[in-house]
């Protein structure tokens, strides 16, 4: 699912803003995930999943930093996230649908934070970008 030049520009422009708030947006995205889809908490039995917890903050930062790697390597997302793909498929065994759920929560968090910048075109570009990441993270399942 190749991104056009315009879509890449839309992703990187918003990412420049998101990158300054990785911890808070990552935390908010995970909190949205757990509030909207409580079944996803089963993958984090060792975490304190209460609102604002240090563990959620840390994992949210990891998730957004991985997205940052994908942005930096937007023409080779597969290569940038190869190790994460193996980790989630072979060790963590995360149900692939959860990547789509988290992507939706990230979209909501970013849109809520930057409403004037999150135009329909930007939304579509980010949706396609996050779908590409989800595809990479689930390709080892096959």
Curated annotation (Swiss-Prot):
Under InterPro entries, the record lists: Globin, Globin-like_sf, Globin/Proto, Hemoglobin_a-typ, Hemoglobin_oxygen_transport, Hemoglobin_pi
What organism does this protein naturally occur in?
A: Gallus gallus
User: What other note does the entry give for this protein?
Assistant: Only one chromosomal locus was found, suggesting that the pi gene either does not exist or is an allele of the pi' gene.
Q: Which family, according to the similarity comment?
A: Belongs to the globin family.
Recorded GO MF terms: heme binding; iron ion binding; oxygen binding; oxygen carrier activity
Binding, heme b: 59, 88
Keyword Metal-binding listed: yes
Q: What does this protein do?
A: The pi' chain is the counterpart of the alpha chain in the major early embryonic hemoglobin P.
Keyword terms of this UniProt record: Heme, Iron, Metal-binding, Oxygen transport, Transport
Q: List the Pfam families hit by this protein, alphabetically.
A: Globin
Q: Name one GO cellular component term.
A: hemoglobin complex
Q: Does the keyword Disulfide bond apply?
A: no
Q: Which Gene Ontology terms describe the biological processes this protein takes part in? A: cellular oxidant detoxification; erythrocyte maturation; hydrogen peroxide catabolic process; negative regulation of transcription by RNA polymerase II
Q: What is this protein called?
A: Hemoglobin subunit pi
Where in the numbering of this chain does the Globin domain appear? 2-142
């Amino acid at each position: 699912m190749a991104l056009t030049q315009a879509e890449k520009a839309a992703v990187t422009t918003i990412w420049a803003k998101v990158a300054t708030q990785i911890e808070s947006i990552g935390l908010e995205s995970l909190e949205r995930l757990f509030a909207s889809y409580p079944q996803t908490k089963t993958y984090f039995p060792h975490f304190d999943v209460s609102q604002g917890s240090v563990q959620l903050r840390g994992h949210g930062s990891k998730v957004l930093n991985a997205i940052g790697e994908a942005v930096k390597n937007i023409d080779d997302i597969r290569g940038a996230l190869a190790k994460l793909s193996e980790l989630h498929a072979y060790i963590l065994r995360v149900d692939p649908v959860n990547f789509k759920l988290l992507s939706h929560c990230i979209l909501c968090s970013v849109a809520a934070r930057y409403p004037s910048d999150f135009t329909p075109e930007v939304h579509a570009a980010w949706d396609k970008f996050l779908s590409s990441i989800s595809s990479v993270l689930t390709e080892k399942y096959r």
